[in-house]
Regions:
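Macromolecular interaction modules
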Residues: 1-248
Length: 248
C-alpha cells in the first residue's frame, strides 16, 4: 500500500532550552516512538523523521528554515487531521505527550504542510541514509505548460538523476493547501531523493554541469524561483505494519 499525500511537520529546537543537546536527544528519542503511534493508524502507510545536515556542503543552495521534519504518508489529508484530533493511545488529546508543557518554549517555528505525491521513482534496491530535497516555485502560465513540465520532470529529469550511483529512489511533491495547515506553505514543488550521502546528489549535479547541462535542462530555469537544495539525515523510518507489530 502506498499513500497519496505527505504531511510534513517542521520545527526547530530552541538553542536556549534547558538541558542542551542531552535534552534534544531525549526529545528525538520520544519523537521517533511517538511517530509510530500515528503510523499504526488506519490510512497511514509510512513515517520518516529527518534532521538538517551538511549546511556548509558546496551542493547546498539557500537556507533551509527548519532543522527537523516529521513526515507522514497517508491515503488522504483528512486521515491525518482526524488522527490529530484523536491523539495516540499513550497520549490521547495531547499531540506532544509528556512534552506538551514545554512545546511552546522548546519547539520553535512549528509548521505543518500537506503535499500531494505526484510520482515516485524506484531506481535501485537498497536504502539511503540521507535525503536531498530540492524545493522551488515555478511560473507556468497555462495548463499546457503545467503538463509539459510535469512530463519532463517525471519522465525525463527524475529518472536521469536517479540513474546516478548512490541515488535509490525519489518522490515528487506539490503543496496541497488545507485548512489544517500551520504556518507558511513555502515552495510549491519538492523533489526528494533518497541518497547514500550528500555527495551522491551533489556529484550527480556536478557531472551534469561538467557535461554542459544547465539546471532544469535550461528549459525551465528562467521560470524557477525560491530555489533551494538541502540535505537531511534520516533519523528513523517506520511502515504501517511494523508500527502495528511494535504496539502489539
Amino acid at each position: 500500500m502506498i499513500g497519496n499525500y505527505w504531511s510534513i511537520v517542521k520545527a526547530n529546537i530552541s538553542p536556549d532550552a534547558p538541558g542542551g543537546q542531552d535534552r534534544e536527544d531525549e526529545l528525538n528519542e520520544w519523537w521517533n516512538d511517538h511517530q509510530g503511534e500515528y503510523v499504526e493508524k488506519d490510512g497511514f502507510t509510512y513515517g520518516w523523521r529527518t534532521r538538517l545536515t551538511a549546511l556548509d556542503h558546496p551542493g547546498a543552495i539557500g537556507t533551509a528554515p527548519h532543522k527537523y521534519h516529521a513526515i507522514y504518508e497517508v491515503d488522504k489529508i483528512a486521515t491525518f487531521n482526524r488522527a490529530l484530533e484523536e491523539g495516540t493511545i499513550s497520549n490521547p488529546g495531547e499531540p506532544w505527550g509528556p512534552w506538551q508543557a514545554y512545546v511552546d518554549d522548546y519547539v520553535l517555528d512549528w509548521e505543518r504542510t500537506y503535499y500531494k505525491v505526484l510520482t515516485r521513482h524506484e531506481a535501485k534496491q537498497g536504502k539511503g541514509k540521507f535525503w536531498a530535497c530540492v524545493k522551488f516555485d515555478i511560473d507556468l502560465s497555462n495548463p499546457e505548460q503545467e503538463a509539459e513540465f510535469d512530463n519532463w520532470y517525471t519522465n525525463i529529469h527524475m529518472p536521469e538523476i536517479c540513474g546516478y550511483a548512490g541515488i535509490y529512489r525519489a518522490w515528487r511533491l506539490e503543496v496541497a493547501p488545507d485548512d489544517g495547515d500551520l504556518g507558511d506553505r513555502r515552495q510549491r514543488f519538492w523533489g526528494v531523493y533518497e541518497v547514500d550521502n550528500p555527495d551522491s546528489f551533489a556529484n550527480a549535479r556536478l557531472d551534469r554541469t561538467n557535461r554542459g547541462i544547465q539546471p532544469f535542462d535550461g528549459i525551465w530555469l528562467t521560470r524557477v524561483s525560491n530555489f533551494e537544495i538541502a540535505f537531511y539525515q534520516v533519523l528513523s523510518e517506520v511502515d504501517h505494519e511494523t508500527a502495528k507489530r511494535r504496539r502489539f
